[in-house]
Amino acid sequence: MAAASPSVFLLMITGQVESAQFPEYDDLYCKYCFVYGQDWAPTAGLEEGISQIASKSQDVRQALVWNFPIDVTFKSTNPYGWPQIVLSVYGPDVFGNDVVRGYGAVHVPLSPGRHKRTIPMFVPESTSTLQKFTSWFMGRRPEYTDPKVVAQGEGREVTRVRSQGFVTLLFNVVTKDMKKLGYDTGPVDTQGVLGPSLPQGNPQ
């Protein structure tokens, strides 16, 4: 008797939120979560996490190193809604309040293999000088009530943002049964791991 053909494929993601560069800030931590379509479902691992607080390195790079692990497996019947990882970086202001220092998002790489991505980060801005001063004085900076909005297009065109900082991610991607369902993800890709990485996932 022939084996039944698979009805779903699997996407396995491991890796780490490696490091960040925020020249103006120190003592930062990072939160991550995954955003995906309605046909996707997590089957193992963690969809979200929060790192430890990292301080800048003492060398010329002044990197904030987290090396925070990512490990999650998804199943789906079609590629629509391919998972994105959303990052939110937080740190103290001059009054000791935790405020957002950057948002960013990038799709999980499509091809199996080891990948490196550098994500430009951004923060929402107040629309007037008075609002900027009030938010600074009260310690309540503009931020999204749900960081997952960063991975979506709706309403983004009316949001005023400012770029600041970069976060570097390492992905190890494994797929299962995609070819059996007729999807070709191409050859194993290691682009950006051996050589210098370029910013990916610019805010729209």
Curated annotation (Swiss-Prot):
The keyword Cytoplasm applies. It holds the Pfam family B9-C2. Transmembrane segments: none annotated. Its main location: cytoplasm. Disruption phenotype: Mice display impaired cilia formation associated with renal cystic dysplasia, as well as ductal plate malformation of the liver and polydactyly. Additional phenotypes, occurring at varying frequencies, include randomized heart looping, holoprosencephaly, microphthalmia, cleft palate, ventricular septal defect and thinning of the myocardial wall. Depending on their genetic background, mutant mice die between 14.5 dpc and P1. It comes from the Eukaryota. GO terms for molecular function: hedgehog receptor activity. GO terms for cellular component: centrosome; ciliary basal body; ciliary transition zone; cytoplasm; membrane; MKS complex. It is found in: Cytoplasm, Cytoskeleton, Cilium basal body. InterPro entries: C2_B9-type_dom (IPR010796). Residues 9-127 form the C2 B9-type domain. PANTHER family: B9 DOMAIN-CONTAINING, B9 DOMAIN-CONTAINING PROTEIN 1. Part of the tectonic-like complex (also named B9 complex). Component of the tectonic-like complex, a complex localized at the transition zone of primary cilia and acting as a barrier that prevents diffusion of transmembrane proteins between the cilia and plasma membranes. Required for ciliogenesis and sonic hedgehog/SHH signaling. Belongs to the B9D family. This is B9 domain-containing protein 1. The lineage of its organism: Eukaryota, Metazoa, Chordata, Craniata, Vertebrata.
